[in-house]
């Protein structure tokens, strides 16, 4: 990996030099736009809509349009702004881990200590881990000041840039203002179904099926040419059960629990042990008939 930024974590008088690396990368298959008729590459040009000319980068300005007025900002205007070039990851405060909302997470970066700062790096990492704390920081990346979270991941410190508060949209849905009551039986069935799918998250067991199928299609076309048999290459998947029909929630839960077996099958009888009201009398009568 190649470092994209070098600087130092600072809090109080402590200074921990680090290198910053992107923690993620895109593995999507790159596809180029072509002219279907002759295979020519599609080129996008910066063409002015008024005079029709192709405009070089040095002649391109930026503008803000509020719907009524347009303010043009030249490269010189933008260059006059106080660009943030600080090389510090400045710790603002230490907060409990659970206070961070994953919705605010943006990009992730690995931090590697400088050869002279390994002990200070390890001390900060251990202090955060033992205290179940996350460091809230500000950092200048690509000339923009970003809010970030310094977190522990294994034996590493990870910088997670955060969205600003006003970048998180508020959610208010009328459909959730009045929620129908949930019965004990519905909750029991839903819990049993959830338990049947319970497990430990292992991300390596999941794969991007679309990208895998796309690579398979590309390989088939390389080998067989344009006459590739798509049905033979991918097989024909069975139509999804149910055909999109709307069914009752209880019926859907019941069928799902019965189909899942395993944990749900063993948990389901327990959900039937304490039916309420009229259901209790019905259940008792059924048991009496069975014993007779």
Swiss-Prot record:
GO terms for biological process: DNA recombination; double-strand break repair via nonhomologous end joining. SMART domains: Ku78. It holds the Pfam family Ku. Residues 9-187 form the Ku domain. Residues 264-285 have a biased composition (Low complexity). Coiled coil: none annotated. Keywords: DNA damage, DNA recombination, DNA repair, DNA-binding. Residues 264-292 are annotated as: Disordered. It comes from the Bacteria. CDD domains: KU_like. One of its GO terms (molecular function) is double-stranded DNA binding. Belongs to the prokaryotic Ku family. Homodimer. Interacts with LigD. With LigD forms a non-homologous end joining (NHEJ) DNA repair enzyme, which repairs dsDNA breaks with reduced fidelity. Binds linear dsDNA with 5'- and 3'- overhangs but not closed circular dsDNA nor ssDNA. Recruits and stimulates the ligase activity of LigD. HAMAP family: Prokaryotic_Ku. PANTHER family: NON-HOMOLOGOUS END JOINING PROTEIN KU. This is Non-homologous end joining protein Ku.
């Amino acid at each position: 990996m190649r470092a994209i930024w070098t600087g130092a974590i600072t809090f109080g008088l402590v200074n921990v030099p680090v290198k910053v690396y992107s923690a993620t990368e895109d593995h999507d298959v790159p596809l180029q736009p072509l002219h279907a008729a002759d295979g020519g590459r599609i080129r996008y040009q910066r063409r002015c809509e008024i005079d029709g000319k192709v405009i070089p980068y040095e002649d391109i300005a930026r503008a803000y349009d509020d719907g009524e007025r347009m303010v043009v900002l030249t490269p010189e205007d933008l260059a006059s702004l106080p660009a943030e070039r600080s090389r510090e990851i400045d710790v603002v405060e230490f907060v409990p881990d659970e206070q961070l909302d994953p919705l605010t997470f943006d990009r992730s970066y690995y931090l590697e200590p400088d050869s002279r700062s390994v002990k200070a790096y390890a001390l900060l990492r251990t202090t955060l881990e033992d205290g179940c704390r996350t460091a809230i920081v500000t950092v200048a990346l690509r000339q923009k000041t970003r809010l970030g979270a310094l977190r522990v991941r294994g034996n590493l410190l990870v910088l997670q840039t955060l969205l600003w508060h006003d970048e998180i949209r508020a959610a208010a849905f009328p459909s959730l203002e009045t929620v129908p009551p949930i019965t004990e039986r519905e909750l029991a069935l839903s819990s049993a179904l959830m338990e049947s799918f319970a497990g430990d998250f292992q991300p390596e067991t999941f794969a991007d099926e679309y990208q895998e199928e796309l690579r398979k299609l590309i390989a088939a076309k390389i080998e067989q040419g344009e006459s590739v048999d798509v049905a033979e290459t991918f097989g024909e998947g069975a139509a999804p059960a149910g055909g999109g029909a709307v069914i009752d929630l209880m019926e859907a839960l019941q069928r799902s629990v019965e189909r899942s077996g395993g944990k749900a099958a063993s948990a389901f009888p327990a959900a039937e042990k304490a039916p309420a009201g009229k259901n209790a009398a019905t259940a008792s009568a059924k048991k009496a008939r069975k014993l007779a």
